[in-house]
Swiss-Prot record:
Expressed by the venom duct. It comes from Terebra subulata (Chocolate spotted auger). GO terms for cellular component: extracellular region. Transmembrane segments: none annotated. The keyword Chaperone does not apply. It comes from the Eukaryota. Residues 1-21 form the signal peptide. It is found in: Secreted. GO terms for molecular function: toxin activity. Residues 22-40 form a propeptide. This is Teretoxin Tsu15.4. The lineage of its organism: Eukaryota, Metazoa, Spiralia, Lophotrochozoa, Mollusca. The keyword DNA-binding does not apply. Disulfide bonds: none annotated.
Length: 77
């Protein structure tokens, strides 16, 4: 099953829950969490640790100078 199929199924399951405000808020939170996880699984996306990357990808610095400072630039590679 592809990620797009999973996303479409999640939308179809969560849409009926959006009949009340609290259910809608809950559905949106679940959907946004799913989208965040799907986004992190794409190589080259930013990350903070290996847990943000899927499969065999690891969170690595783009270049040595970018690893220094408060906001190091890291990508799933």
């Amino acid at each position: 099953m592809t990620k797009l199929t999973v996303l479409l199924l999640a939308i179809l399951v969560l849409l009926p829950l959006a009949t009340s405000n609290s259910a809608a808020d809950e559905a949106l939170a679940s959907l946004s969490g799913l989208l965040r996880r799907a986004k992190r699984c794409v190589p080259q996306n930013s990350c903070t640790s290996n847990a943000d990357c899927c499969g065999s990808y690891t969170c690595s610095c783009v270049s040595q100078p970018s690893c220094k400072g408060m906001n190091p630039r890291r990508r799933c590679m």
